[in-house]
Amino acid sequence: MTDLPFVTADLPGSGGALRRAPEDFRVDEVPAYLPSGAGPHLYLRVEKRGRTTRDALRELARALGVPERDAGAAGLKDKDAVTTQWLSFPVARDPDPAALAAPGLRVLEVSRHQNKLRTGHVRANRFTLAVRGGDLARARDCAAALAARGLPNFFGPQRFGAAGRNAAVGRALVTGERSPEAGRAARDRFLRRLSLSAYQSLLFNRWLAERMADGRFAAALAGDVMKKLDTGGLFTCEDPATDGPRVERFEISPAGPMFGHALRLAGGEAGAREARLLEAEGIALADFVRGGGEAEGTRRAARLRIDVALEPLEDGYRAAFELPRGAYATVVMRELTKADAELPEED
């Protein structure tokens, strides 16, 4: 992410080291809904240390006597952290939580619900991170600036794969360029979707970086597709003088392009900016039909409200904050520390 701008570029970072131990990085999943307490699906809220979500699903499905494919999770969490989340299983009986305990895995709550948990059934993630050797006073200045200016909703480096290879393969799929990696991705639906998504994310980051460089990060442009931050609804900006103050109040945000063949188009000045980005890439929206037509296109908020709580540690500080699904803690910590680090986030 070294080529991306900071919204707090005028402030020095705290420095410090992230993630020296799993306990230094905690992620608590905030579900889209809570289990009702009744229904055919057993819901378990679990805490994991040094285990991935798939590890936990496999272990618990085996203990409960159900196929792993029938287990459900709203999101995948990395093993190099302490994480909590709900998992679901089609089990009629209520088990003893203690009997399900395993190394690095314990059950915190048991409930039931009518449906299986599925990918995306999550509202947000709550992060708690220790920054060893970080300067708390500097972190506080950066956190205050973020609260006032907003968080640029960049994709983190996890999205792009080692050395950005996933995005490069995605571009090859869109342009029709032939390569062994693109050939493999074209035949494998998982790799194809991963690569196309990485390329869409790369273009979004470029769009947002240009917007920040032009001083339009917290502004509404004529023709912008805008996103309501409370409901996710989209509309087109017709009067920047009316919508601009709403952007400043974090009611709405410009919604940047995740380019695809069926993308909702921006108009006016905003549409012209997006068209120039595509032209510079040498592609058109119709090119995204390649690769199976799965890259339909969508819109992503450019700017998020962020409230970072800080507290001192003997050797640094602890930062806690909540982000909506799809936003990256890496981006927050980069603003606070002014250092690039890849955190073990869901992706």
Curated annotation (Swiss-Prot):
Catalysis: reaction(s): uridine(13) in tRNA = pseudouridine(13) in tRNA
InterPro entries: PsdUridine_synth_cat_dom_sf, PsdUridine_synth_TruD, PsdUridine_synth_TruD_CS, PsdUridine_synth_TruD_insert, TruD_catalytic, TruD_insert_sf, TruD_pseudoU_synthase
GO annotations of cellular component type: cytosol
EC number: 5.4.99.27
Active-site residues per Swiss-Prot or TrEMBL entry: 78 (nucleophile)
EC top class, as a word: isomerase
Keyword vocabulary terms for this entry: Isomerase, tRNA processing
Molecular function as annotated in GO: RNA binding; tRNA pseudouridine(13) synthase activity
TRUD domain: residues covered: 150-304
Superkingdom, natural source: Bacteria
GO biological process: tRNA pseudouridine synthesis
Function per UniProt: Responsible for synthesis of pseudouridine from uracil-13 in transfer RNAs.
Similarity section: Belongs to the pseudouridine synthase TruD family.
Protein name (database record): tRNA pseudouridine synthase D
Gene: truD
